A protein has these predicted regions:
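Non-catalytic propeptide/linker segments at domain boundaries
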Residues: 49-114
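Bacterial N-terminal signal peptides
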Residues: 7-15
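Activation targets extended, charge/polar-rich intrinsically disordered C-terminal tails
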Residues: 25, 33, 42-43, 50, ...
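Glycine-rich catalytic cores of cysteine/serine-nucleophile enzymes that process amide/ester linkages
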Residues: 118-195, 228-240
Length: 329
């Protein structure tokens, strides 16, 4: 696991530059080796070769060389990474430039904004951010939920719903959204705290996040993963430089004293694009040992679960009750 993280961290450094040469005329297929199921004589050399080829895949993700790198890996090792890559590329290209969750649907005029600390969750595939994270994240619940925010009721103005009042993440990193933004999401639900809250403690937690959410504070970045396209380099919860929306929500409640990351067993991680590529990588690296392969995959997913705060994990948290939901696709 540690070797993989080091490899991926190195690979993630380079995402631009001259086009790489992925020549299919010189590819040496290893399919027969893998099909044999017999461990190679030099396991260390095999793992180094696989790691080097996989590093090229990581380097190419998000560039013009992506399709070629994935196809080369497939041709050499008999995997189907190109299918996963095609879905990822389509996600990145989909409806570029829209706000997170902005939609063609009518505004949700009945969405409530009346509970301090209420959590707002949205999903759907009508924008670029949504399609990318929808591809990466497991999809267990109706709504394809991926985005989140937490309401600071003291900032909400019922006479002007264009004021910033929901702590979340935007393109700069941590930031604010408006009630008007949320009325125009694709799919959405509202979660109220299931237990009574101490206002002074909640105010303190919201004030802490306000430092990062301040629209003039740009000493940070947005990302579900470090370097954005490197889907393996997961941002940790403790990191206060790289923010994504549900991590902001988690921080508010963590400061309050609640851990709202449920890590629910109801969430099926095998439905995620992240799982698909990790599975293919380890299936090649440890083709001769299903025990090693399965353990490596399990260890990686366990690490991802520990660090990632999914919208679905917040929806399934016992700290909240769902009081509103509107699923339109």
């Amino acid at each position: 696991m540690k070797k993989l993280l080091i490899l991926l961290a190195v690979a993630a450094v380079v995402f631009v530059g001259c086009a790489k040469d992925f020549s299919f005329d010189t590819v040496e297929s290893k399919k027969d080796v893998i099909d044999s199921g017999v461990a190679p004589e030099d396991i260390a050399a095999w793992e180094s070769e696989v790691d080097a080829d996989f590093a090229k895949v990581m380097e190419a993700l998000g560039t013009e060389d992506e399709a070629s790198a994935l196809a080369y890996f497939d041709a050499k090792y008999g995997t189907e990474m190109s299918k996963t890559g095609a879905r990822y590329a389509a996600a990145r290209a989909g409806s570029s430039g829209k706000k997170s969750g902005s939609s063609k649907y009518p505004a949700m005029t009945n969405m409530p904004f009346n509970k301090d600390g209420a959590v707002y969750i949205s999903g759907g595939t009508d924008d670029m951010v949504g399609t990318v994270i929808d591809w990466v994240s497991p999809k267990t619940l109706p709504g394809s939920y991926y985005h989140g925010a937490v309401l600071d009721l003291d900032k909400y103005d019922p006479n002007n719903e264009s004021v910033y009042c929901l702590e979340t993440a935007i393109t700069k990193g941590a930031g604010y959204e408006t009630a008007d933004d949320w009325r125009n999401k694709v799919n959405a639900c509202v979660l109220n705290p299931a237990y009574s809250m101490t206002k002074s403690k909640l105010d303190s937690a919201q004030a802490y996040m306000d430092y990062y959410c301040d629209m003039n504070n740009k000493n940070m970045e947005y990302g579900f993963f470090k370097n954005t396209v490197n889907i393996f380099n997961v941002v940790t919860k403790a990191d206060t430089y790289t923010w994504y929306c549900t991590k902001v929500v988690w921080w508010v409640y963590n400061k309050y004293g609640w851990d709202i990351d449920s890590n629910s067993s109801r969430i099926d991680w095998t439905t995620s694009g992240l799982y698909t590529i990790v599975k293919d990588y380890y299936a090649v690296r440890y083709f001769y040992s299903s025990k090693k392969k399965n353990q490596a995959i399990a260890d990686y997913i366990a690490t991802a679960k520990q660090n990632i705060v999914l919208a679905e994990e917040i929806v399934l948290s016992p700290y909240f009750n769902k009081v509103y939901e509107n699923i339109r696709e």
